[in-house]
């Protein structure tokens, strides 16, 4: 049975947060409040209820969470930890942390892209007797391959690897560093999902009476080799350069970047190594795909052709 008229808080105003907010507003009867560190006059003008939150002030967070049943977070680091603490104190029933990528258990301990995610999951585990939580797993967002990068969708602003061409392929200049092999020298695979489809699945999950600890969704699963070939075919141009990589070589490059103190290169290499090691791959169909067969995700080729249509 759908959960009726819940009060749902979305923390953050990135592109994914706003897609989820739009989906809630248009297709559910839930009450929505968007939490932001700055005043959102534009969103308020569009009819959204917004609350300005100071994450350094517990009473500010408590006030914003009054009567909230479920929190969906897209904020990371210390603000998210404070949000979790406040959610527990305000007796919020459910909390979805800012994950929206691969399986956390496969992440490196010292992942440069962690952004406090490990600490957030540990805190939710600590409070598991008081608040329900889930990790939304969607693999790689299509928007990583977008014209002007996923930063143009206001996604991944804290990752340091959200620019055009930062991940696997630069489709404008037709260059690629492709992590096509896994540790066994087999072809590596990954799952990908559009941000719009992630929003659809997340909003459907609001109506589930109990959340599983992890809930996966996907738009498409393919080998990295198939992905770069698909991008080449969509662009109808040959690669000017393409490097086929395996985990050992990527780890060597990453170690060299660490020794040189080259943080920018580390941030670009870390997701490639994670891809080669299968961190963005999981069993399909996804859990939420199975529960919502009426949602037909956009295929990567369809999304890519539309996104790059205006670029020669």
Please report, for each region that a protein language model flagged, where it lies by residue:
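Amphipathic alpha-helical segments that line or abut small-molecule/effector binding pockets
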Residues: 85, 196-204, 301, 305
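Amphipathic terminal alpha-helices
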Residues: 286-312
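A short acidic, often aromatic-flanked loop/helix-cap motif at beta-alpha or helix-coil junctions
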Residues: 56-62, 141-144, 247-254
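General small-molecule cofactor/ligand-binding pocket signal
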Residues: 33, 49-51, 134, 240-245
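Terminal hydrophobic/aromatic helix or amphipathic segment near a protein terminus
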Residues: 215, 220, 224-282
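NAD(P)H-binding glycine-rich loop region in Rossmannoid oxidoreductase-like domains
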Residues: 36-93, 97, 101-109
């Amino acid at each position: 049975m759908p959960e009726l008229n819940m009060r749902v808080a979305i923390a953050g105003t990135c592109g994914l947060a706003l897609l989820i907010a739009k989906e809630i507003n248009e297709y559910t009867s839930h009450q929505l409040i968007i939490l932001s560190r700055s005043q959102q006059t534009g969103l308020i003008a569009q009819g959204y209820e917004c609350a300005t939150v100071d994450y350094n002030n517990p009473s500010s967070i408590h006030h914003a969470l009054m009567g909230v049943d479920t929190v969906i977070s897209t904020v990371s680091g210390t603000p998210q930890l404070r949000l979790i603490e406040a959610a527990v104190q305000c007796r919020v029933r459910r909390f979805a942390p800012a994950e929206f990528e691969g399986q956390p258990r496969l992440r490196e301990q010292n992942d440069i892209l962690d952004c406090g995610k490990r600490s957030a999951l540990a805190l939710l585990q600590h409070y598991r007797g008081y608040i329900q939580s889930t990790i939304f797993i969607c693999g790689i967002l299509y928007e990583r391959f977008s014209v002007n990068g996923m930063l143009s969708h206001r996604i991944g602003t804290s990752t340091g690897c959200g620019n055009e061409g930062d991940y696997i392929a630069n489709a404008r200049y037709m260059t690629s560093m492709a992590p096509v092999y896994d540790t066994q020298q087999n072809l590596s695979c990954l799952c990908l999902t559009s941000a719009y489809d992630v929003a659809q699945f997340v909003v459907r999950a609001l109506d589930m009476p109990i959340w599983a600890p992890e809930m996966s969704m996907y738009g498409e699963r393919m080998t990295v080799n198939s992905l770069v070939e698909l991008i080449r075919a969509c662009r109808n141009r040959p690669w000017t350069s393409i490097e086929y990589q395996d985990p050992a070589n990527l780890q060597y490059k990453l170690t060299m970047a660490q020794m040189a103190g080259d943080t920018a290169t580390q941030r670009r290499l870390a997701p490639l190594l994670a891809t080669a090691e299968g961190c963005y791959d999981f069993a399909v169909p996804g859990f939420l795909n199975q529960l919502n067969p009426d949602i037909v995700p956009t295929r990567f080729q369809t999304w890519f052709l539309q996104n790059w249509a205006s670029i020669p």
